[in-house]
């Protein structure tokens, strides 16, 4: 019997309790012998150099239409060597780059949070289709990752 495939979609980076669960749960799932793919937005606070992110050209290059506007979908990946796991990052300059997660530095929510969530969800689904990978279970962790 083949290993169950789990798609783990999270919104946070390790700065909160929710993010710590989002970091540890995929590892526990993998340690149980499941095949897992983890996705998260490439927030502006994620350091590409320190985390050794690189663009996956074969997965990038598509545009997603949100509210009648084309937005380029950029896919980046980082390997967690000690965990033998990869994390895919959904990136877009308008929605994620140079921004905090859901609120600005003054605590005010971004007006386009709904659009950002739609872009993220569609970006994950389109990327999984391009990977030709069909999960048995989809786990959405946090409201931004809700499908």
Where are these predicted regions, by residue range?
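Nucleotide-activated donor-dependent transferases that construct or modify glycoconjugates
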Residues: 2-15, 40-42
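Structural motif
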Residues: 5, 136-137
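A short, glycine/small-residue-rich beta-strand->loop->alpha-helix junction that serves as a flexible
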Residues: 11-21, 47-49
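A short, Lys/Arg-enriched amphipathic alpha-helix followed by its capping loop at the start of a domain
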Residues: 24-34
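Hydrophobic anchor at the start of a short beta-strand
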Residues: 34-36, 87, 135
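A conserved catalytic-core segment of Leloir-type glycosyltransferases
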Residues: 38, 42-130
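Short His-centered aromatic/hydrophobic patch
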Residues: 141-144
């Amino acid at each position: 019997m083949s290993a169950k495939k789990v798609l783990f979609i999270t919104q946070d980076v390790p700065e909160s309790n929710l993010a710590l669960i989002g970091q540890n749960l995929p590892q526990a799932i993998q340690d149980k012998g499941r095949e897992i793919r983890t996705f998260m937005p490439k927030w502006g606070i994620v350091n590409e150099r320190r985390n050794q992110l690189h663009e996956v050209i074969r997965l990038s290059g598509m545009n997603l239409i949100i509210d009648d506007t084309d937005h380029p979908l950029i896919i980046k990946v980082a390997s967690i060597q000690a965990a033998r796991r990869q994390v895919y990052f959904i990136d877009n300059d308008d929605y994620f780059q140079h921004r905090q997660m859901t609120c600005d530095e003054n605590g005010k929510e971004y007006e386009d949070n709904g659009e950002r969530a739609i872009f993220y969800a569609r970006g994950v689904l389109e990327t999984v289709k391009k990977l030709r990978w069909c999960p048995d279970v989809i786990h959405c962790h946090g409201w931004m990752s809700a499908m």
